[in-house]
């Protein structure tokens, strides 16, 4: 032990006297606010190249959650890093303000139940309320984002409801329209009757859209009544009953046709005597391959009368299920459709063209117009009087009852299936034919697939996997919403179909030119009030009126890159030269949401991707592995975590996990606290060690010749290079790994192995202090984006300068590289770790010296110059090096059957048996077993100890250590003395002595240990700074300190 001087560091104290990270973080946040450090980080790069980052706008009518927290950390790390790399990185926050989320929240707060109440209130009042409610939690958001040490510009943030933003949105609409990429159509769409609006296909693919639901299924009979002349229908089938299966009985009143597959074989089957009651003797028509699925209903002795290709059914007519539309033109015939399969049902599909996209396509080809007996509330209309006013799902019961009464239900079951629901209200959707405006995505689909190849995805497999496959199947995007609060569809049409005209507007100037007034709002109802006479109507009676729908809120979000800068009305040159963005990040579900629609609009408008690099992270789960739920309480409260462990701890836990590589992550308090131990504490402990022993300011130096200094500086070189490579690739988890491994080498090896030099002081060993200073100053810069507040405290304490976040990221070239030394020293660490594992397994304390350690490595001679380090670290008297690994262990080959099996087939078992029998040899870089060559990855090699009890493998190398654990009386005495020293050090500490205080010691020792105490007295006294050291057997009284069991001591300051 030696004297601790200290007092030089910190040069700037940001701890506020606290040793708790959360309290230090509050001090840092307060400093940043007063200092305006964030703005300074941008201003100092005004002449630098911009790094463009798109921050996906959240809704501010709800509080942030773990998903926002996770994404927010990435959104902070990348800009911080790129700033330190010399770029100017503006970070403007934005708010998503339009759409159903805002309307539903407003309805909830106003107690509104339906659209009728909104219209009674008035659109102006309702939308004004929406405008206020969407910003309800902006203060909480700002506090949350600020507390997580995320630097963003709130003051100049954009809102999608801003007039400038909305003008850019309508510009985009018109630009797409002029390119032939927007059209109006009548198509079957997912429709939310609860919210009175259609949705887009991608909205039904969001995480929460599909839910399990029980629904009735019916198999109904359709009596064949005739054939259409000129078709190839087989008249012999007249009088039979086609049977059709449906999971939506409520669509049967709208049935207008049946569909069969021309390539499928159908069977005419007679129901046997023990078949379904009421159908015995009837002849039923269904796909031959599905006859077995109806074995129970058809009866034991049911027989196939005849078989017919699907082409013989096409053109047959049948008796309608209901009479509502009996006279509908061209209806109630069997049509051909390739989409019909024999995977389930009967192979005959009922067609209700108003409620199924495939049905619509098939019936359109046969000139059968759809009928729509369902209103915007999802209820039946007067077209079906028996069910008028009933919600379609509620009507199932009555429809089934009526069909059974008619004898038309052959089978009635209940199915539990995954069914789409509204992602906002949670109510089940229906599919219904509606007029709508569409982006013609299919027209640019191939180009979208092509430009996706220019995007760098993390994880990489998403490019051609989840995102690429979605692009390949992309469909036209329905952008109409029959709602109130949103960007308007900027289309005006004539209100007289005799004088048709369509005008599309893309700017305030164009609107002002035609309507004579410049809009101050593009929201409803104000935009709806703009009307003018139809220029194409010579009578002057018709009027141009805006179509009532608003745009899908995702059109707003997808317009963010250009709309946030009011393109093309402002910042045109800037945007044209700064797109695509360098980087974006959101969770993986956005491959069908924001990522996708950014890509659609960018390719459609600019023929390029919207972003160059993207991270699609996984999902944060509760501590039970399930979705986070406030009612279940299955996740740590964020505020409590911030108060207890700090934001940096949470940041490290999330960023170092597999979630940034697309995996999911279970959040636990234990995991967060473990994050503190991985990087924050090691860094802080190394800094505190320097604080404790430095008597003067250290200086930057990489010139030390000491082997430990050379090692840690070479490790520092590798750290900077590896973290730079990882963050350049946006592999944040890998960057965290590198920092964690370095911190382990720094504190658990370098500082510990260098303690004697530090205890001797900076006059005796300035190179040690300068090296540690250099390492810490560099390490804090490397880790600054990952632990922004912890590193700020340490870096300012070390340097006294303004902020670590105003510095440049280190260059690996600033440090000496020494790959051989790093490899050798890391092997030594591995040797010591392996030896320690043997001690631990045998419960041999580290202070007990052992006689010998044998190190077996193929090139063990490289360790010869470092035996003293190994001896001291492992606490052995001798270290033997040998290159004869076979003397202490053997290499075994293990076949990876899962990998080798597909290639080797049945020979894989032969190879496994040969390997187990030792019938194999290594040939070059491969293994040959029983004459069969195994390829890389099809096998692994492992080193097995000859005596596992005293042997352990060295990590990451083909080597073993063998520990001699025979304890002699001399070694036991020496270990006892070391234990006494440790006990006396504890006594010094509990007595409140300073590290440098000299003391007097009286040690009371049992008679059998007197000789040990006397033999090692000088050593013990020297270690505990005792100027007087007396050994006795006397009782030292109640105030004595227990040093060991049966050993007490009195200590006094000199």
From Swiss-Prot:
GO cellular component, one term: cytoplasm
InterPro entries associated with the record: aa-tRNA-synth_I_CS (IPR001412), aa-tRNA-synth_Ia (IPR002300), Anticodon_Ile_ABEc (IPR033709), Ile-tRNA-ligase (IPR002301), Ile-tRNA-ligase_type2 (IPR023586), M/V/L/I-tRNA-synth_anticd-bd (IPR013155), Rossmann-like_a/b/a_fold (IPR014729), tRNAsynth_Ia_anticodon-bd (IPR009080)
Subcellular location as annotated: Cytoplasm
Enzyme class, spelled out: ligase
Zinc found in the keyword field: yes
Short motif 'KMSKS' region, span: 627-631
Principal subcellular localisation of the protein: cytoplasm
Record-level Gene Ontology MF annotations: aminoacyl-tRNA deacylase activity; ATP binding; isoleucine-tRNA ligase activity; tRNA binding; zinc ion binding
SUPFAM superfamilies: Anticodon-binding domain of a subclass of class I aminoacyl-tRNA synthetases, Nucleotidylyl transferase, ValRS/IleRS/LeuRS editing domain
Reaction it catalyzes: tRNA(Ile) + L-isoleucine + ATP = L-isoleucyl-tRNA(Ile) + AMP + diphosphate
Binding sites annotated in the UniProt record for ATP: 630
Co-factor(s): Zn(2+)
Known partners and oligomeric status: Monomer.
Domains: entry comment: IleRS has two distinct active sites: one for aminoacylation and one for editing. The misactivated valine is translocated from the active site to the editing site, which sterically excludes the correctly activated isoleucine. The single editing site contains two valyl binding pockets, one specific for each substrate (Val-AMP or Val-tRNA(Ile)).
Its job: Catalyzes the attachment of isoleucine to tRNA(Ile). As IleRS can inadvertently accommodate and process structurally similar amino acids such as valine, to avoid such errors it has two additional distinct tRNA(Ile)-dependent editing activities. One activity is designated as 'pretransfer' editing and involves the hydrolysis of activated Val-AMP. The other activity is designated 'posttransfer' editing and involves deacylation of mischarged Val-tRNA(Ile).
Alphabetical list of HAMAP family matching this protein: Ile_tRNA_synth_type2
Protein name: Isoleucine--tRNA ligase
Source species: Corynebacterium efficiens (strain DSM 44549 / YS-314 / AJ 12310 / JCM 11189 / NBRC 100395)
């Amino acid at each position: 032990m030696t004297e601790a001087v200290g007092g030089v560091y910190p040069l700037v104290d940001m701890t506020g006297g606290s040793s708790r990270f959360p309290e230090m973080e509050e001090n840092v946040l307060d400093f940043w606010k007063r200092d305006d450090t964030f703005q300074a980080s941008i201003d100092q790069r005004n002449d630098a190249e911009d790094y463009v980052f798109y921050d996906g706008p959240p809704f501010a009518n709800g509080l942030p959650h773990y998903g926002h927290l996770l994404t927010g950390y990435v959104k902070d790390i990348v800009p911080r890093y790129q700033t330190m790399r010399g770029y100017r990185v503006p970070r403007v926050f934005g708010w998503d303000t339009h759409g159903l989320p805002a309307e539903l929240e407003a309805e909830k707060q106003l107690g509104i139940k339906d659209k009728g109440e909104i219209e009674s209130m008035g659109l102006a009042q309702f939308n004004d309320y929406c405008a206020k409610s969407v910003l309800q939690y902006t203060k909480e958001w700002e506090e949350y984002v600020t507390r997580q040490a995320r630097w963003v510009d709130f003051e100049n943030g954009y809102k999608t409801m801003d007039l400038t933003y909305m003008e850019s949105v309508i510009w985009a609409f018109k630009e797409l329209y002029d390119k032939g990429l927007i059209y109006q159509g009548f198509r079957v769409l997912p429709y939310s009757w609860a919210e009175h609006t259609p949705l887009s296909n991608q909205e039904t693919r969001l995480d929460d859209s599909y839910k399990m639901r029980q629904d009735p299924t019916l198999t109904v009979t359709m009596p064949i009544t005739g054939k259409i002349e000129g078709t190839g229908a087989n008249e012999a089938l007249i009088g039979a009953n086609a049977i059709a299966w449906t999971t939506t009985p409520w669509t049967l009143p709208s049935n207008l046709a049946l569909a069969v597959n021309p390539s499928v074989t159908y069977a005419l089957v007679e129901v046997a005597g023990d078949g379904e009651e009421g159908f015995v003797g009837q002849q039923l028509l269904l796909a031959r391959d599905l006859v077995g699925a109806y074995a129970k209903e058809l009866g034991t002795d049911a027989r196939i009368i005849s078989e017919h290709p699907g082409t013989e059914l096409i053109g047959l007519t049948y008796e309608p299920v209901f009479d509502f539309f009996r006279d509908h033109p061209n209806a109630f015939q069997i049509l051909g459709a390739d989409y019909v399969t024999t995977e389930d049902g009967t192979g005959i599909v009922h067609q209700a063209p108003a409620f199924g996209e495939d049905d619509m396509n098939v019936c359109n080809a046969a000139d059968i117009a759809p009928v729509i007996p369902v209103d915007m509330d999802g209820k039946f209309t007067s077209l079906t009087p028996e069910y008028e006013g009933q919600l379609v799902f509620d009507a199932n019961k009555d429809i089934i009852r009526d069909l059974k009464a008619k004898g038309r239900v052959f089978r009635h079951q209940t199915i539990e299936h995954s069914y789409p629901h509204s992602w906002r209200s949670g109510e089940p959707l229906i599919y219904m034919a509606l007029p709508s405006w569409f982006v013609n995505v299919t027209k640019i689909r191939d180009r979208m697939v092509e430009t996706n190849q220019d995007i760098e995805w993390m994880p990489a497999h998403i490019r051609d996997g989840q995102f690429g496959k979605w692009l390949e199947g992309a469909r036209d995007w329905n952008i109409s919403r029959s709602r109130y609060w949103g960007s308007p569809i900027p289309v005006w049409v004539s209100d007289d179909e005799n004088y048709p005209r369509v005008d599309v507007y893309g700017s305030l100037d164009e609107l002002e030119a035609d309507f004579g007034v410049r809009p101050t709002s593009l929201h409803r109802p104000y935009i709806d009030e703009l009307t003018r006479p139809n220029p194409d109507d010579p009578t002057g009676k018709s009027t141009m009126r805006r179509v009532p729908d608003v745009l899908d809120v995702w059109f707003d979000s997808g317009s963010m890159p250009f709309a946030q800068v009011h393109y093309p009305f402002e910042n045109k040159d800037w945007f044209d030269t700064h797109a695509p963005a360098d980087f974006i990040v959101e969770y993986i579900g956005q491959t069908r949401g924001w990522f996708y629609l950014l890509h659609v609009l960018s390719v459609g408008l600019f023929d390029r991707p919207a972003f160059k690099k993207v991270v699609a992270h996984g999902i944060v789960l509760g501590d039970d592995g399930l979705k986070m739920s406030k009612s279940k309480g299955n996740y740590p409260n964020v505020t409590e975590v911030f108060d207890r462990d700090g934001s940096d701890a949470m940041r490290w836990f999330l960023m170092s996990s597999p979630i940034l590589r697309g995996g999911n992550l279970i959040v636990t308090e234990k995991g967060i606290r473990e994050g503190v131990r991985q990087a924050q504490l090691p860094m802080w402990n190394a800094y505190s060690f320097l604080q404790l022993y430095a008597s003067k300011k250290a200086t930057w130096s990489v010139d030390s010749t000491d082997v430990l200094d050379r090692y840690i500086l070479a490790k520092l070189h590798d750290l900077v290079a590896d973290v730079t490579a990882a963050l350049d690739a946006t592999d944040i988890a890998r960057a965290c790994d590198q920092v964690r491994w370095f911190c382990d080498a720094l504190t658990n090896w370098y500082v510990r192995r260098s303690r004697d030099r530090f205890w001797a002081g900076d006059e005796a060993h300035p190179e040690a202090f300068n090296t540690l200073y250099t390492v810490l100053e560099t390490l804090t810069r490397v880790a600054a984006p990952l632990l922004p507040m912890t590193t700020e405290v340490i870096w300012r304490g070390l340097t006294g300068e303004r902020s670590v976040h105003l510095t440049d990221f280190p260059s690996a070239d600033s440090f000496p590289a020494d790959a051989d030394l790093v490899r050798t020293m890391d092997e030594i660490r591995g040797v010591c770790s392996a030896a320690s594992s043997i001690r631990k397994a045998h419960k041999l304390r580290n202070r007990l010296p052992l006689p010998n350690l044998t190190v077996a490595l193929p090139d063990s001679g490289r360790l010869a110059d470092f035996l003293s380090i190994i001896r001291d670290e492992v606490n052995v008297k001798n270290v033997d090096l040998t290159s004869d690994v076979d003397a202490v262990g053997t290499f075994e080959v293990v076949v990876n059957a899962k990998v080798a099996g597909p290639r080797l087939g049945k020979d894989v078992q032969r190879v496994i048996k040969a390997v187990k029998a030792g019938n194999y040899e290594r040939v070059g870089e491969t293994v040959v077993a029983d004459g069969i060559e195994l390829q890389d990855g099809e096998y692994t090699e492992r080193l097995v100890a000859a005596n596992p009890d005293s042997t352990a493998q060295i990590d990451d190398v083909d080597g073993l250590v063998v520990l001699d654990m025979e304890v002699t009386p001399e070694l036991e005495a020496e270990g006892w003395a070391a234990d006494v020293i440790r006990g006396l050090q504890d006594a010094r500490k509990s007595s409140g002595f300073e590290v440098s205080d000299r003391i007097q010691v009286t040690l009371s020792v049992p008679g059998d240990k007197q000789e040990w105490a006397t033999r090692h007295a000088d050593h013990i006294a020297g270690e505990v700074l005792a100027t007087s050291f007396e050994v006795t057997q006397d009782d030292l009284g109640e105030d004595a300190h227990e040093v060991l069991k049966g050993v007490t001591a009195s200590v006094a300051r000199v």
